């Protein structure tokens, strides 16, 4: 059996372009989006990875939690990160919804690997 990799996008994170692409000449603290316009906002995909090989089925990362669909949910879940990061998670794009579309139940996963532990999905 070979290895298959499927990239599953679980919405986007809306941030100031200075957060991922800080350039010389950007104002100090521009990554916070303080005193900057809507034109400085960008949407960055929040991705997970489904890997299937002879060792089984592995999910790498879990993406946005559905609680982040509401503003209050984001404020509670993202806490101090909320002013800098805004979640956009359309219906049907949460990881559990996408796995269900594929006929995969959480118990079918052999391994869940978290690449990092942010408050939004850890």
Report the location of each language-model feature.
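Metallo-beta-lactamase
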Residues: 1-97, 108-120
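Glycine-rich nucleotide phosphate-binding loop and flanking beta-alpha elements
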Residues: 66, 120-121
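Well-ordered alpha/beta subsegment
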Residues: 99-104
